[in-house]
């Protein structure tokens, strides 16, 4: 096997510790924050990455005024690193015992739970079969309240995608949805089924319609996603949700020029980073590794 400069690569190996540090830096895009997360000094982390670059014979990072970004070889390595770490952890859990034990209370919005939780929980359970994950569903503002009360240990939440937040794990586009064949142009004002008034989908819908000069009325407001979807299925209102979570029997509405485009939202994790349990930290790292690939 030959490297980029023709050197023989048979004597080289991608060390697990180096790959773990690399993935964390790739996620937070800043050495200082990455060093705090992995429990090393910034100097030690820099030395680790220099060693990894020497092993792969490629530059992996480019420094910017705000931190670091991955080079093209770095982006390629990230895909391999996430897969290698996942398989390594699964093998260790299988061969060395039952993995972590205990209970974690995990908060997640309904639309994310529907789409993302099955694969996330399935893979985590294969690594830690004795761990129990209790699910608490609710909109982001309610989950943040639960975190403040320590009623949940870890929460997946939405936040505005302003392009400057390094904590975003995945981005999701907000879309208008309605019952197939139902035209928003036939309604004035436009009837809406929205989540709680302090949620991003509610705020985004009202702001967009206000800027477009489109009259609307909130026909139904609730933190229950099932209730919102039921109202849309009845043909009584239109709603806003992430594109990934749109049910197969409902339609994304994009043919009305008076129905303005909506922003994207970011997904991140919130928990007590100063004193997380081993189980909380492990589940958070699992989500960070797997969620971008779902």
Swiss-Prot record:
Q: Point out the DNA-binding stretch(es).
A: 31-50
For the keyword S-adenosyl-L-methionine, the answer is no
Keyword flag Transcription:
yes
Domain HTH lysR-type: from-to ranges: 14-70
Q: Name one GO molecular function term.
A: DNA binding
Please give one Pfam family short name. HTH_1
The record's keywords, sorted A to Z, are: DNA-binding, Repressor, Transcription, Transcription regulation
Instruction: Spell out the family assignment given in the record's similarity comment.
Output: Belongs to the LysR transcriptional regulatory family.
Per its record, how is this protein called by name? HTH-type transcriptional regulator DgdR
* Lineage of the organism: Bacteria, Pseudomonadati, Pseudomonadota, Betaproteobacteria, Burkholderiales
